[in-house]
């Protein structure tokens, strides 16, 4: 089934991308000894696999083309999604998304988590004011407490976003529950649903802080 960009799910759907290439790269991301350059490259690769799956049901439209052998009918995307990485960590997923969706518009949401309350605080918001029912891909490597993702999705809803698809490498059950209960996202694609959060809101077994591991603060 393919969906128009304005379609909203009555209940958030959750898809775990179960594939050997995804699992192998996830193992490398989890490994403590993986150095920053490799971590960034592997994050880009696994993000490409996830975005590929996240766009599987995107609406398409027929288009007439000419091949070297004659005319035929192909397809194009009915409406190119808007891509919104959640800063900082989501920046590492952006190149992969734009590699597959080169015509996509990009918005940025920068959120910092208060380590005491675990609530997000926005320091950047360049989401287009009127998304006009456009589908949006939210990129964030980690769905932990879910607060940052819910905050981002609500900003998108306020800008009249259509179908919101969240793309995460790792997800905690608590974060999935928070996102689902908020009603702010339509679909979640993730490479793994991990065991739980620890007492300071980090995913277990997880991979540490995805932002720090990309940008040299860990």
Residue ranges and their predicted role:
Residues 1-218:
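PRPP-associated nucleotide enzymes
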């Amino acid at each position: 089934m393919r969906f128009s960009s304005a379609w909203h799910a009555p209940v958030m759907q959750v898809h775990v991308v179960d594939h050997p290439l995804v699992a192998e790269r996830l193992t490398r991301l989890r490994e403590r000894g993986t150095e920053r350059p490799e971590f960034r490259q592997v994050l880009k690769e696994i993000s490409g696999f996830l975005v590929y799956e996240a766009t599987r049901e995107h609406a398409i439209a027929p288009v007439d083309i000419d091949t070297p052998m004659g005319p035929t009918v192909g397809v194009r995307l009915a409406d190119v999604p808007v891509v919104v990485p959640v800063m900082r960590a989501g920046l590492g997923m952006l190149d992969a998304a734009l590699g597959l969706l080169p015509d996509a518009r990009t918005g940025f949401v920068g959120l910092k988590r208060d380590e005491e309350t675990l609530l997000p605080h926005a320091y950047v918001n360049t989401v287009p004011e009127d998304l006009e029912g456009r589908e949006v891909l939210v990129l964030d490597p980690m769905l932990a407490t879910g607060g940052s993702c819910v905050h981002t999705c609500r900003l998108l809803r306020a800008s009249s976003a259509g179908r919101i698809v969240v793309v995460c490498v790792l997800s905690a059950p608590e974060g999935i529950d928070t996102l689902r209960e908020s009603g702010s996202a339509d679909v979640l694609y993730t490479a793994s649903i991990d065991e739980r959060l620890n007492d300071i809101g980090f995913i277990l077994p997880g991979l540490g802080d995805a932002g720090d591991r990309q940008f040299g603060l860990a």
